[in-house]
Amino acid sequence: MSILIRGGTVVTADQSLRADVYCSDGVIKAVGPDLAVPSGAGVVEAGGQYVMPGGIDPHTHMELPFMGTVASEDFFSGTAAALAGGTTMIIDFVIPNPKQPLLEAYDAWRGWAEKACADYSFHVAVTWWSEQVHKDMGVLTKERGVNSFKHFMAYKNAIMADDEVLVNSFTRARELGAICTVHAENGELVFHLQQQLIKAGITGPEGHPLSRPPEVEGEAANRAIRIAEVINVPVYIVHNSCRESLQAITRARSEGQRVYGEVLAGHLLIDDGVYLNPDWDTAAAHVMSPPFRPKGHQEALWQGLQSGNLQTTATDHCCFCAPQKAMGRNDFTKIPNGTGGVEDRMSVLWHHGVGTGRLTPNEFVRVTSTNAAQIFNIYPRKGSVSVGADADLVVWDPKASRTISAKTHHQKVDYNIFEGMTVTGLASHTISQGKLVWTDGKLNVQRGAGRYISRPTFPSVYGALNRQAELKRPRSVQREAVR
């Protein structure tokens, strides 16, 4: 199948230019003005619209077994919803149970993901430590195309990685040339605060943000960053929700450390007032970790995105329907943590980013696609509009509008955290692997069409880190022997 996208403005992370884009056999074959229509090619008229790299959501959880239930969104429905919003690839997470071999968990997630209709990859979580984990990390990087390992500093008595696990895993990642990703919340403090709140009779969703204040996130982010500094490994802090974690990242980056930061679309726009909603179901629907914060944090996060100290935008798409959330009706600590957004991320960020002047269209491409592709080493195959790149593209209508609602979205969940928000700037066409999968409000997807994307490790980054380490290597002091 071949497609010519004609008459649009190509927008990449670096430039904007009037050009046509020709795609064939799943890749981009030509980019330039006034391309001739090859025989048999379909034509997408993109006049007045932007042609951009498809979005990459680097943080999703499809079909996640968590907190006594399983996320309602599966890999087919979730990737279909992503395509409807202009996102053409997700990076999900393999999360082994404590004592479960990493390879066993990886194989399970690969099996679940076979139904995906868009391309995907996996971070793998390190939830415990042993020689088996050490060995499995090596197999995953060398034979399975994994270059990133996740560490949960929260969820005590479940999947929390303590400092010993962090040190061992970060050290092994450095040996392998991988990057470490971190959910930064002090799990011991969260557990302590949860118990105090329950004893005080605060059992509803309003207790959730009280048990996870910004200081808990800031401390953990700083600790993970400093451990990474000592071990000399790159680190990526996921879902930054507050100025405290942003400050830790900004400080480390100003000191030359290789630290990256992610922000969720929801954390840029929603405040903690949602937990005070008198309707329990509405309040519980917003329970996720880290929680939504007081309004002042949102502007700080936007500034982090504008300054480049936060490089990527994600969703942490992890859906639980109302009956699942109701598992914690009498105890907020039992409400399954997670919200949706994989379908809405691009339009929400365009409306509130480009539409307000916070971001240029090029910066939008950078934070929704290209930076993630570069950080996780799949660029320029993904995240670019260039000859030889995968034909994963979105044709973006900057004037089209819609009102977001659970009644009309494609996500498999019965609420939407952006409910009632009217956004301007939508995907008119989404192209995945060179095929039109979203056209003017209609999906045309194939179950199982998604491919697993291998991600190699980072020899150039580690080459630089190794040179720095050699220059700083401690050397013993040569002294005369005592006579």
Named regions from a protein language model:
Residues 8, 26, 48, 59, ...:
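Divalent metal-coordination and catalytic microenvironments
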Residues 203-234, 282-286, 306-313, 319-399:
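His/Asp/Glu-enriched, well-ordered alpha-helical/loop segment
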Residues 111-126:
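A glycine-rich helix N-cap at a beta->alpha junction
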Residues 46-115, 132:
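Metal-associated gating/positioning segment near the N- to mid-region
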Residues 327-331, 387-453:
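C-terminal cap of metal-dependent C-N hydrolases
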Residues 91-92, 121-124, 234-239:
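Short catalytic-loop micro-motif centered on adjacent basic/acidic residues
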Residues 135-313, 318-321:
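Histidine/acidic residue-rich metal-binding segments in metalloenzymes
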Residues 1-53:
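Histidine-rich, glycine-flanked metal-binding segment
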